[in-house]
């Protein structure tokens, strides 16, 4: 296969304010839409043979604005289920749990529908996605595979790709509306690019023309 192209969705109101967002299905902000459109030149020269996308609206809209055609909706790409910490910021959690760390402690129990996930459970999902990617790559030759998803999940996916434990995801910071790439060197998994984005000063160029109404 070629490389694995990781794309984090554009900004939402909750990502801007630092709230943990998993199942809450928020749209992109105006800035988030500009970030998504600005991905186009960052992936224009890539030969992408398959796009896998989280079912969340923010991920699907990012893929659409980035020009990624015929994405495959992949439920395992959903964000870490934050359980009782959905919509809560890290600062707020630290008021009652000063030493709390998502990567080692997991989350507080949530509702029956969204009980929360342990780090191990998220790692298992990432492993399933990597298995799906490797299977698909067998018929794609040297084409890249794009994955449009969420910060914490993509960080776990990266850790597992590199042979690290789930907690290794803490080593990788990932901004909204960014592109990262995973590949190989001498047969070993490596990061070939990380957290790429257009400078904020150029994002206005990615705004839609006033005569156009966004879908």
Q: For each of these PLM feature ranges, what is it?
A:
Residues 1-2, 81-92, 139-143, 159-215:
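Acidic, low-complexity terminal tails and accessory targeting/binding regions
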Residues 3-7, 52, 140-149:
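Beta-strand elements within well-structured catalytic alpha/beta cores of enzymes
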Residues 8-61, 112-127:
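Loop-to-helix element that buttresses phosphate recognition and phosphoryl-transfer chemistry
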Residues 38-101:
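Phosphate-coordination/substrate-recognition cap region in phosphate-metabolizing enzymes
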Residues 44-47, 133-143:
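Glycine-rich phosphate-binding loop signature in dinucleotide/nucleotide-binding domains
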Residues 65, 156, 160:
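Active-site signature of alpha/beta-hydrolase-fold catalytic machinery across serine-
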Residues 100-137:
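Internal catalytic-core helix/loop-beta-alpha segment
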């Amino acid at each position: 296969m070629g490389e694995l192209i990781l794309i984090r969705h554009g900004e939402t109101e909750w990502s801007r304010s630092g709230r943990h967002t998993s199942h809450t299905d928020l749209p992109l902000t105006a800035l988030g839409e500009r970030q998504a459109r600005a991905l186009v030149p960052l992936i224009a020269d890539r030969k992408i043979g398959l796009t896998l996308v989280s079912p969340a609206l923010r991920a699907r809209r990012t893929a659409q604005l980035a020009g990624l055609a015929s994405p495959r909706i992949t439920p395992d790409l959903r964000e870490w289920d934050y359980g009782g910490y959905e919509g809560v910021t890290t600062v707020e959690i630290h008021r009652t749990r000063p030493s709390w760390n998502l990567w080692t402690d997991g989350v507080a129990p949530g509702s029956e529908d969204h009980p929360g996930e342990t780090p191990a459970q998220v790692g298992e999902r990432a492993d399933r996605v990597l298995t799906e990617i490797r299977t698909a790559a067998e018929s794609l030759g040297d084409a890249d595979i794009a994955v449009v998803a969420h910060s914490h999940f993509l960080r776990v996916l990266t850790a597992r790709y590199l042979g690290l434990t789930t907690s290794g995801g803490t080593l990788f910071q990932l901004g909204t509306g960014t592109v990262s790439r995973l590949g190989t060197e001498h047969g070993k998994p490596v990061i070939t690019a990380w957290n790429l984005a257009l400078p904020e000063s150029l994002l206005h160029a990615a705004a839609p023309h006033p005569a156009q109404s966004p879908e």
